[in-house]
Amino acid sequence: MGSDKKTPEEKRKHKRSSPSSPLDEVKSKRQNIKGDEERRKEKKDKSKKEKHKSHSSEEKKSGEKHKTKSHKHKDKSKNKFEELSKDDYFSKNNEFATWLKDKKNLFFSDLSSETARDLFSDFVIQWNKGKLDSQYYEGIATGPRSSHAWNIKK
């Protein structure tokens, strides 16, 4: 059990495989880091060039322009309401009764069912053209039904 000590030759064998100094290792690591950074920058530059393609002035003049705000506004006003048909007679009855009173000076209760249907078709035409006031498209809770002034006390 005598000798746990290693000879100087054995110590040299286990320390390092190459005879380089610790400063050489630091330098080589720094060089690798710099090389990596340069490669990353090159990749970024390439990707930027691919993403940012400029258009010539000829393409812009040829009519490939985006819609202006006024065009967008017109499109929204068209889709603001749903189109009606004669089948919507019962669902839009409050709006129809209000329209009768305001535009035709008639009350819904004074009309026969046939006359009311005919006038409703006129109402549908005005509705679909978008010529009615915004209150009609937003919805009306109750409409005027008769000319009688009800005197209900609370």
Swiss-Prot record:
InterPro entries: SCI-1-like. It comes from Nicotiana tabacum. This is Style cell-cycle inhibitor 1-A. PANTHER family: STYLE CELL-CYCLE INHIBITOR 1 (PTHR34117:SF1). Specifically expressed in flowers pistils, especially in stigmas and styles. Barely detected in roots, stems, leaves, sepals, petals and stamen. The keyword GTP-binding does not apply. Its main location: nucleus. GO terms for biological process: auxin-activated signaling pathway; cell division; negative regulation of cell division; regulation of auxin mediated signaling pathway; stigma development; style development. Keywords: Auxin signaling pathway, Cell cycle, Cell division, Developmental protein, Nucleus. The gene is SCI1A. It is found in: Nucleus.
